């Protein structure tokens, strides 16, 4: 039902193999997302993302459709409010998509941004509870991906070994990578959000704007460099390096979304390994969709 149209891949670029480029497809039906993922793949993007709603279009069905139509481009969520999930459900969805795509999935997680479309369906348990749930969900996610027998006992979730209908493992080992929001609070000696991000495979960096309750991002290249240094120290304490670890900066080289802007090379020099275009300034309209497609066809801002 889709006809592939070659757009001409953008090659090379001065940032080399270390810097990769993604885009959030902001407003699109499942079919439109799949078509735009094809456009992005042909134009040289490295990954496309969808957002995950509390109620609405299912992110994993959407990514599954894109997985069947594409061959190379990675597929991810930005973001999955993982604390809302039962961890075995999340592990099932991500592993299924990883097998379907041939190992092209990234799970992006955070505590979730509270808004009317969330609170219309469930009360907020509080940031501290969501944080503890997020940690447990990720622990169980990783454990189940490793196969059976697996057992876990936590404050909110538990799991016992099973022997029947055990699914095959994901393609990516030990599991599809997890990228976590990592919020650095300059006034705090302990950085719990960064500690979480350091335990996994990548970080969406953010700088708190005064308090945890108002974490408006104040990310700058110098702040990113400090955050990456802190992550490096945390990983070193656990016997890990930054080799293969992803630092993902969101920005908008076309419009006005957020406070993070190019030049992209400054972010690469500060430690970023991914630049992700987030075009939330575009309207949810035929004109907005046409502009999103045009931006994807231009390819990533490699030069």
Regions found by a protein language model. Name each.
Residues 8-303:
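Active-site-adjacent structural elements that line small-molecule/cofactor binding pockets in enzymes
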């Amino acid at each position: 039902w889709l006809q592939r149209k070659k757009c001409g891949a953008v090659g090379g670029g001065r940032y080399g193999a270390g810097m990769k480029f993604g885009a959030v497809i902001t407003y699109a039906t499942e079919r439109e997302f799949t078509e735009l993922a094809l456009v992005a793949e042909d134009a040289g993007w490295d990954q496309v993302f969808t957002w995950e709603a509390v109620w609405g279009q299912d992110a994993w069905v959407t990514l599954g459709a894109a997985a069947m139509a594409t061959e190379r481009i990675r597929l991810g969520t930005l973001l999955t409010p993982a604390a809302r999930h039962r961890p075995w459900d999340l592990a099932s969805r991500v592993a299924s998509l990883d097998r379907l795509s041939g190992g092209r999935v990234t799970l992006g997680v955070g505590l979730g941004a509270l808004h009317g479309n969330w609170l219309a369906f469930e009360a907020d348990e509080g940031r501290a509870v969501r944080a503890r749930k997020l940690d447990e969900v990720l622990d169980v996610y990783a454990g189940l991906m490793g196969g059976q027998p697996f057992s876990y006992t936590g404050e909110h979730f538990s799991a016992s070994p099973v022997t029947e209908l055990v699914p095959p493992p994901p393609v990516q080992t030990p599991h599809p990578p997890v990228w976590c929001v990592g919020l650095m609070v300059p006034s705090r000696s302990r950085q719990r959000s960064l500690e979480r991000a350091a335990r996994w495979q990548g970080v969406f960096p953010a700088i708190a704007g005064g308090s945890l309750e108002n974490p408006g991002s104040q990310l700058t290249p110098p702040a990113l460099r400090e955050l990456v240094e802190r992550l490096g120290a945390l990983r070193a304490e656990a016997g890990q390096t930054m080799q293969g670890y992803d630092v993902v900066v969101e920005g908008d080289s076309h419009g006005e979304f957020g406070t993070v802007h190019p030049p992209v090379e400054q972010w690469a020099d500060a430690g970023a390994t991914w630049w992700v275009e987030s075009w939330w300034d575009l309207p949810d309209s035929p004109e907005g969709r046409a502009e999103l497609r045009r931006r994807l066809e231009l390819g990533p801002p490699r030069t």
